Amino acid sequence: MRRSIRCAAGGALLACLASAVPQSASAQDWMMPPPEKRCPSPYGADDERGAANLQTPESVLAAARLIRDGKMYELGKMLDRTIPMSPGRSFVLNLQRTSGPNGRNQQGGNEETVFTELGQMGTQFDGLAHQQLGPYLYNCVEAEKVARRGGFTKLGVEKAGSFFSRGVLLDIAALKGVDMLADDYMITVPDLEAAMKQANVEIRKGDAVLIRTGWGRLWTVDNARFIKGEPGIGLEAAEFLVKHNVMIVGSDNWAVEVRPYPDKGLFLPVHGFLLNVNGVYLVENLDLEALARDKVVEFAFIVEPLKLRGGTGSSVAPIAVR
């Protein structure tokens, strides 16, 4: 069963791919819809912001009204050389004295030089140029036509903007009564629905949905296991979130989706479905333990990617405020 519908410009995000994922739980025969079935974006052929278009002054004010006592939760992980990293990535910080002591007050300065990948390190925000389906980025932009040594000329992470939205925590690990889901557990639509019911929350248009798997407990404790695989959402859960018109999907693992994917013929299909097809942003490696401990399930979620011109993503330090 292969399902797809054409994305009509100006239509709702749901109309873009309401039936792109088959109803079978395994999705063994699922294929990404071809360019003519997924483009142009519902936000227009020239759109570079994807689901960020769902954020409005009204939605920002609604998110601000969720703040009751002003307690802040830092959702970003510490950045240093001990963190888990994908092959080929590294993090080195070199401290240096840059000036001084100067003047009668003996003023001096210190700076650091950091050698790392700014876009995909630590707690990270995936922009719309991070992944591609064949030759195409989001909105069927041909990667080769916009890729330069100094970055992408379209769909750079600087186009995403800043986010101040309603955030929802769906604690799947707690739902299952475990500290951490199994390595290869694929989160399903019934899991999301049960977590919503347990938390007594609904998912609304423009939300940031944060999914706790417990996998973050391995961070700097067992980096090899953390990187090898992970529990996460599958395609049908991703479709469920798109149907609710979410803006951001985040998790405490490194790819949001289950890895490796059960269908060995698919590689990072949730990335493709959310980023490339629907323009929904991902935030990976979140620290969700304090939110889970305090049972905070609805909050204001704030994240701002670096203005890295032409970048594919950004290290970020999101916060939740209740």
At which residue positions do the language-model features occur?
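Bacterial N-terminal signal peptides that target proteins for export
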Residues: 1-12
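Bacterial N-terminal signal peptides
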Residues: 10-20
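Long, low-complexity intrinsically disordered regions enriched in Ser/Thr/Asp/Glu with frequent Gly/Pro
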Residues: 22-24
